[in-house]
Amino acid sequence: MPELPEVETTIRGLSEVLMGEKIIDVKVRRASLRRPIPSDIQERLIGSTIISLSRRAKYGIIVNDRDDALIFHLGMSGRWKINPENFEKHDHFVLQTKNNFIVSLYDPRRFGSLDLVKKNQLLEWSYFRNIGPEPLTGNFNPEYLQKKLFSSSAPIKKILLDQKVVAGIGNIYACEALHQAKIHPQRPSKNLNFDEITSLVFSIKNILQKAIAEGGSTLKDYARPNGELGYFSTKFKVYGKEGEQCECGHTIERYTLGGRSTFLCSSCQK
């Protein structure tokens, strides 16, 4: 599933062709995503001008000059394509601008979504209402995380995946950040001391920034809007590397935690 770096990369790619553009056409080729595409999406978007593109957690937000906010989630396999040569079966949504830029939302597994709300309702939108701070902002800091971990006996990896605690982190980057911080994913959260929490916060920010710089991580379906792959997957230290050697020489292990594959080096991570 695309996580924060993939959505951030997507928003940056879309911004290059959509920012300030007037929308002249919208086509819903197949409305059956995780939730049906809003039936009034054409009348609300056609003729409007895009004034901002941003990200919140794993969602992208495109706002027009009518204060309509188009919110997308890429699900398991979704991605945006810029000026595709032709449309495929799973190009669900197509938007065209006055300067002849065409973008399409492609999602073969249909776990993605498109929603449309008023800009002033974004903070109270059901999926944003209780979401945690962005990990790349100052609001996500060791003091904040310490308060969240203080009384929890849940495994630290499970806490990092809780979007109410911190926004946008998924399985890939939780595994990589915990490895960099040398913390075992199963450690009870309340057992981490402040130095370890500080190291973990640094590692989360560092891993996410590196991933964004590499355009995210391509495993199966993800690609940037311009068609380029995300190359951070070539820099993984543990994710997807069961049976391979860690940099320390120990064998990387995999086990299931909370229904998700978890990769670690039990020699490095304590």
From Swiss-Prot:
One of its GO terms (molecular function) is class I DNA-(apurinic or apyrimidinic site) endonuclease activity. Its EC number is 3.2.2.23, 4.2.99.18. Binds 1 zinc ion per subunit. One of its GO terms (biological process) is base-excision repair. A zinc finger (FPG-type) spans 237-270. CDD domains: EcFpg-like_N. Its cofactor is Zn(2+). DNA binds at residues 90, 109. SUPFAM superfamilies: Glucocorticoid receptor-like (DNA-binding domain), N-terminal domain of MutM-like DNA repair proteins, S13-like H2TH domain. The keyword Iron does not apply. It catalyses: Hydrolysis of DNA containing ring-opened 7-methylguanine residues, releasing 2,6-diamino-4-hydroxy-5-(N-methyl)formamidopyrimidine; 2'-deoxyribonucleotide-(2'-deoxyribose 5'-phosphate)-2'-deoxyribonucleotide-DNA = a 3'-end 2'-deoxyribonucleotide-(2,3-dehydro-2,3-deoxyribose 5'-phosphate)-DNA + a 5'-end 5'-phospho-2'-deoxyribonucleoside-DNA + H(+). Signal peptide: none annotated. The active site is at residues 2-3, 58, 260. SMART domains: Fapy_DNA_glyco, H2TH. The keyword Lyase applies. Keywords: DNA damage, DNA repair, DNA-binding, Glycosidase, Hydrolase, Lyase, Metal-binding, Multifunctional enzyme, Zinc, Zinc-finger. Pfam families: Fapy_DNA_glyco, H2TH, zf-FPG_IleRS. HAMAP family: Fapy_DNA_glycosyl (MF_00103). Involved in base excision repair of DNA damaged by oxidation or by mutagenic agents. Acts as a DNA glycosylase that recognizes and removes damaged bases. Has a preference for oxidized purines, such as 7,8-dihydro-8-oxoguanine (8-oxoG). Has AP (apurinic/apyrimidinic) lyase activity and introduces nicks in the DNA strand. Cleaves the DNA backbone by beta-delta elimination to generate a single-strand break at the site of the removed base with both 3'- and 5'-phosphates. NCBIfam families: fpg, PRK01103.1. Monomer. Belongs to the FPG family. This is Formamidopyrimidine-DNA glycosylase. It comes from Zymomonas mobilis subsp. mobilis (strain ATCC 31821 / ZM4 / CP4). The lineage of its organism: Bacteria, Pseudomonadati, Pseudomonadota, Alphaproteobacteria, Sphingomonadales. The gene is mutM.
